Regions:
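Beta-strand-rich domain onsets/edges
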Residues: 19-36, 40, 58-59, 100-112
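Exposed beta-strand and adjacent loop surfaces of beta-rich binding modules
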Residues: 23, 34, 47-51, 85-87
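Short, aromatic- and glycine-rich surface loops/edge beta-strands on solvent-exposed regions
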Residues: 82-96
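A short beta-turn/strand-edge loop motif at beta-sheet boundaries
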Residues: 42-48, 81
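Glycine-centered loop-to-beta-strand initiation motif
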Residues: 63-77
Length: 112
């Protein structure tokens, strides 16, 4: 019986750690010409594949692009209506996360 309690206690400690080990983290920055999207799992590894969806401030899909092999994607601002800000979503199939760029974020990095 004590072996069962020890096993149960061990599993209780391990399960939360392994559940959080694969959280996807997304970051996006602007250099005035493009948005640079970076996606990494909480263990530091880049996703092998995934999609980047760019939505406007009203959640209208503007474009969908594939992630590069290093977990990044450069999204040109030319042709995107970013006046209301942008929502950058990354979906790897089993994990997803997003980053919000406000109009102020974009203007600040573009010097306007």
């Amino acid at each position: 019986m004590s072996r069962l309690r020890a096993l149960t206690a061990s599993l209780a400690l391990i399960a939360p750690a392994s559940a959080g080990a694969h959280q996807l983290n997304v970051f996006a920055s602007v250099d005035c010409e493009a948005v640079l999207v970076e996606a990494k799992f909480s263990n530091g590894r880049a996703p092998v594949e995934g999609k980047v969806r760019v939505l406007d401030g009203e959640n209208t899909l503007l474009t969908t692009l594939a992630l590069e092999a290093d977990g990044t994607r450069r999204v040109p601002l030319d042709g995107l209506d970013h006046s209301g800000g942008l929502v950058i979503e990354v979906d790897t199939g089993s994990h997803d996360d997003y980053w919000i760029l406000t109009p102020e974020d974009i203007a600040r990095h573009c010097g306007s």
